[in-house]
């Protein structure tokens, strides 16, 4: 898999971008990971790439994906921020935050 100019998770915005999710869906096709990202992409489109609800299994799949697949594609700091956010989501309401909970 080649590196993309887009990243699937923006630490500064604390969310997925629909374009990056689209890239990952294309990269993984009809595999379980591809289906997961297709589901997330659909949810992002319904909400205009704002907030997206993730189930515990989806969060678990994303943690697996970071640990086993994309760790070589992205900077370590981005992945650490990503995993911290996923850890918080496991114990919080299942909403992918558009911005920091303290913002605004």
Where are these regions (language model features)?
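Positively charged, low-complexity terminal tracts
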Residues: 1-104
